[in-house]
Amino acid sequence: MICAMRSALCFALTCLASWIQLAAAETCDLLIRGGRVVDGTGSPAYFTDVAVKDGRILALGKLNIPAAATIDAQGLIVAPGFIDVHTHAENIEDLPLAENFLRMGVTTLVLGNCGGSALNVAEFFKKLEAAGISPNVATLIGHNTVRTHVMGGSFMRPPTDEELAKMRSLVEQAMKDGALGLSTGLIYLPGAFAKTEEIIALATAVAAADGIYVSHMRDEGAEIFEALDEVFRIAREAGLRAHVSHIKLSGKASWGRATEVIAAIEKARADGLDVTQDQYTYTASSTGISQLIPETAREGSREEFLAQLADPDKKAKIIGEMKDKLKRGKREDFAYAVIADYDKDTSLNGKNVVEAAKLKRGSDSIDDQIEMILEIQRNGGATGVFFGIDEEDLQRFMQHPNTMFASDSGIRKFQEGIPHPRGYGNNARVLARYVRELKLLRVEEAVRRMTSLPAVTFRLKERGQLREGSRADIVIFDPARIQDRSTFSDPHHYAAGFKAVLVNGVVVVKDDQHTGARPGVIVRRQ
């Protein structure tokens, strides 16, 4: 009798709990109706409704519940918000709407790449939370930032034991404060002078917190295999996941070797390493014009650089090294390098070095091209766009299942300079050119590379998939109309084709226009 009463009571309580749950689910903040859901896993798309409540996905299915707002998604794709794992969006403090990212569907940005980041991660996060931001933000801790803080201008050497201990302590604190891992920029100063052993020592601190090592490698051209081996060694000896930033083969001398690069990565994975990579979908890169100048000439202060140029012998050595590098890359001149943002003389923005030399020096000889480069650096430097990537290599990297899509961009100031178009169009370009036009990828696979793959790799929990209970970062786009509109010659155009972009359940983009909302949160390592 007692057992029967207990069973009846349990049944009644179960029914009551189910009724309460059903009642709570009878209303939602937003109902997305009739869309073709691409859930981020790579599974085939299917048609269903999506209900959003309190910043999370409440339910998926054929839903008939009251909603405060409704979006008709018939004929449109509904997918998780895109995650960009390689940005330089530290300027989000000044540009919190991050419009170029949101308007191409990116809802979560990973900052701190290429070795450069905020030093005090906790303080940086605190500022962003106080200001309010449109996208979600996570960060890595940058090796160059840490090395500069500890070693100052004396960086052409290994750190002392005491300095290395200080660097490690800073990395450990950043990880405690929520950084996702450690990034390096090994073509930049001061990281270019760091030995592999130094990076391993710092990476072990990251491994202890289940972080990731993310590297702009020492070389992406003739010595790319040696650079990859260094990444693999760091991952192996430190015992952590590794990620190769903006994978590419730079310069004609290296073109056609993408299959070999992929084979090297696959061998490392077969040997037990967890290695992934990202790419931007353009045949040009972008960094400082200073990268055309030898490291040894850039290693000191601006005054020291100017002193080298004033010394005839030292200047002749710099010029000779620049000519040698040009020949090694099988290039005849510097026409591949375009000035993107030069504050000293904006009339040169959009012109390549050959054109700039002809315009300003009256000659486009190699010597005058080099003088033009040195003059730009003498006047404070400029960012540049460098054409040197083969489309066939790009597509081979794209077809690898562990290649993510990342912009390598900061937040754009609209109509300022002639920047690389990737900052406005990278994700939309994947879906327009490589999915719709070239059919190189299925839409389900392309979306997986932008969502669940980066979420799992970088440990961004509750994001990257459309499923009940996950954060409601959602993009709704027209697969027939989605388009990158930014070009190298005319870059300041936002992507098109987005019906809506939601961040934590709040509509941030509506019909290709930013709403001004700032619902973004800090995504800390968990």
Task: Annotate each PLM feature.
Residues 25-31, 37-81:
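Histidine-rich, glycine-flanked metal-binding segment
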Residues 8-21:
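Bacterial N-terminal signal peptides
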Residues 35, 50, 55, 75, ...:
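Divalent metal-coordination and catalytic microenvironments
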Residues 140-141, 145, 149-161, 165-189, ...:
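Active-site neighborhoods of metal-dependent hydrolases
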Residues 35, 311, 395-402, 407-408, ...:
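C-terminal cap of metal-dependent C-N hydrolases
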Residues 173-231:
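Divalent metal-binding pocket/active-site signature
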Residues 26, 73-78, 82, 87-89, ...:
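Divalent-metal coordination cores built from histidine and acidic residues
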Residues 37-49, 354, 381-394, 438-447, ...:
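Acidic, glycine-enriched loop/beta-strand segments at the rims
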